[in-house]
Amino acid sequence: MQNLPALLLFCGVVCSAYPVDRAAEDENNNMELTQQYLENYYNLGKDVKPFVRRRNSGPVVEKIREMQKFLGLEVTGKVDSDTLAMMRRPRCGVPDVGDFTTFPGMPKWRKTHLTYRIMNYTPDLPRDAVDSAIEKALNVWKEVTPLTFSRTDEGEADIKISFAVRDHGDFNPFDGPGNVLGHAYPPGPGIYGDAHFDDDEQWTSDTSGTNLFLVAAHELGHSLGLFHSADPSALMYPVYNVLADLARFHLSQDDVNGIQSLYGGPPSDSSNDPVVPTESVPPGPGTPAACDPTLSFDAISTLRGEFLFFKDRHFWRKSLRTLEPGFYLISSFWPSLPSGLDAAYEETSKDIVFIFKGNQFWAMRGTEVQAGYPKGIHTLGFPPTVKKIDAAVFDKEKKKTYFFVGDKYWRFDEKRQSMEPGFPKQIAEDFPGVDSKVDAAFEAFGFYYFFNGSSQLEFDPNAKKVTHVLKSNSWLNC
């Protein structure tokens, strides 16, 4: 036991030194993170590296201040806890330097119709979910510009989209899970215009992992010529912002201003624009209030990238172009339609909205009723016992329409124009958690939204489960 004092002395020295060593190691890691971040995103020269440990080094402090200002942090010139937390968040791999919302020289496409090709797929999602996320991401920019997009499955394309890990041949390697989510190149030939996504991330259609739609909409903004924005509410802000409710997604005014500085606004005379009154209906006695906590909807449909929520004689129109929904009379848009609709859905490939009331339905393109309508709902294949439709939703990936009646549903094949055999089925059987009658339904962002009274259920068709319970009027900013 004579060596015990020496052993205790040794342990005391080591143990007391350990926190100091750990603190020094943390400090070293923080400095390395800062150095790398400033080199990657703020053009800090690699020859400045010896100065990074000198806290008052002019080049480093100025770059830290530049970063803090751009990212909306308190400008201290010091690597404080907020700055460290921001640097550790997932983000885009495109640098932030510059006081502009477009790339230097404002590169842009010299045409308004662009092609895109999905070169490969992530194993994290079904192929149709990836296709849908990319299409929706491009539609975000299509809504506010004259740009149109078409997909090709072979040959060259203006924008090539791919998933890759680590070094993938563009001298801009990915870094594994977290940190850099993707990067893209400004308009031009060859690799320019292409968007790459780090396949070490866990890509999802919801917010349980990294949402592919949100990241793709950002990266494709780069493919169209946009640089990063210093506005934290902008889609083009470099750091990934998770939205608790994807239904509330909209472009910021900064995003709109940036893309329209390159391409202008959408053509006002486009046949693809809904013809809707420019002025909303003023609220008055007897008109439904958007933020009434008991508000329910008669029917809901999409229309050329917008959302229409029908109630009695009125409807709300929600667009990605504007934050606030408009409120209109149905008769001002569709003079021949009745009020108090039962169901509606858009068949996007035909540019037609089908609207149901009682035992009849109408096919509308723009404001025009199509020839031969209204028709009886039994021409679709419903039995005589079905007197009306409660709700309908079109799955544009499968080209199927789901019709809900009471606690059952039918499925209609839009390609074959016939009701599928084996129906009706119980709603709860194939839509677990959707146990009550469905008043209205539609599809958006890869989810089905089922409405009953003042509540709505967000349903993931891939996972076959309800992911959120929301108020029906959450789409109206309530």
From Swiss-Prot:
Zn(2+) 2 binds at residues 92, 218, 222, 228. Glycans are attached at residue 452. A motif (Cysteine switch) lies at residues 90-97. The active site is at residue 219. Residues 18-99 form a propeptide. Keywords: Calcium, Collagen degradation, Disulfide bond, Extracellular matrix, Glycoprotein, Hydrolase, Immunity, Innate immunity, Metal-binding, Metalloprotease, Protease, Repeat, Secreted, Signal, Zinc, Zymogen. InterPro entries: Hemopexin-like_dom, Hemopexin-like_dom_sf, Hemopexin-like_repeat, Hemopexin_CS, M10A_MMP, MetalloPept_cat_dom_sf, Pept_M10_metallopeptidase, Pept_M10A. GO terms for molecular function: metalloendopeptidase activity; peptidase activity; zinc ion binding. Ca(2+) 2 binds at residues 158, 190, 194. Its EC number is 3.4.24.17. GO terms for biological process: cellular response to amino acid stimulus; cellular response to reactive oxygen species; cellular response to UV-A; collagen catabolic process; extracellular matrix organization; innate immune response; negative regulation of phosphatidylinositol 3-kinase/protein kinase B signal transduction; negative regulation of reactive oxygen species metabolic process. Ca(2+) 4 binds at residues 298, 390, 439. Residues 266-277 have a biased composition (Low complexity). Ca(2+) 3 binds at residues 175-176, 178, 180, 198, 201. Its cofactor is Ca(2+); Zn(2+). Its main location: secreted. Zn(2+) 1 binds at residues 168, 170, 183, 196. Belongs to the peptidase M10A family. Metalloproteinase with a rather broad substrate specificity that can degrade fibronectin, laminin, gelatins of type I, III, IV, and V; collagens III, IV, X, and IX, and cartilage proteoglycans. Activates different molecules including growth factors, plasminogen or other matrix metalloproteinases such as MMP9. Once released into the extracellular matrix (ECM), the inactive pro-enzyme is activated by the plasmin cascade signaling pathway. Also acts intracellularly. The conserved cysteine present in the cysteine-switch motif binds the catalytic zinc ion, thus inhibiting the enzyme. The dissociation of the cysteine from the zinc ion upon the activation-peptide release activates the enzyme. This is Stromelysin-1. It comes from Canis lupus familiaris (Dog).
